[in-house]
């Protein structure tokens, strides 16, 4: 697996930012230390994804699901990460439901994107017309009420 990591990397700026946020302000780290962290992260990701793939294969699944990753973490004895990751998964699923609801609202309308755009443009036109009409008629109303 270590040989495979020559072809992939983690974004150095992202890793640098993560390390900087974790370290005390008075601590520094070298580029070599950052490279070791990057390579360790890559190796961890490769091991975890390989184990999760194995878990999916054992269930005759062709897609790795979050449950497979969690089982892989258990198998690798990283149980302390699981509650945190399950919370992240719940938050992600919640945000996906909101997105799906928004997306399905337009799909359920039965209208094409072009038709929806045309309706939106018409609503804008009507709104501008009302705004223009109100701004023209308001001075007259204020003169009448004097």
Curated annotation (Swiss-Prot):
Swiss-Prot/TrEMBL GO biological process terms: cellular response to heat; negative regulation of RNA polymerase II transcription preinitiation complex assembly; negative regulation of transcription by RNA polymerase II; negative regulation of transcription by RNA polymerase III; positive regulation of transcription by RNA polymerase II; regulation of RNA polymerase II transcription preinitiation complex assembly; RNA polymerase II preinitiation complex assembly
One protein family per Pfam: CBFD_NFYB_HMF
Primary location recorded for the protein, binned into one broad class: nucleus
UniProt entry tagged with the keyword Membrane: no
CC per GO annotation: negative cofactor 2 complex; nucleus
TM region(s), chain numbering: none
List of residues that carry Phosphoserine: 135, 137, 142
Region of interest: Disordered: 124-146
One Gene Ontology molecular-function label: protein heterodimerization activity
Misc. comment: Present with 2950 molecules/cell in log phase SD medium.
The protein's assembly and partners: Component of the NC2 (negative cofactor 2) complex composed of BUR6 and NCB2. The NC2 complex associates with SPT15/TBP. Interacts with SPT15/TBP.
PANTHER family: PROTEIN DR1
The protein's name: Negative cofactor 2 complex subunit beta
Naturally occurring in which organism (per UniProt): Saccharomyces cerevisiae (strain ATCC 204508 / S288c)
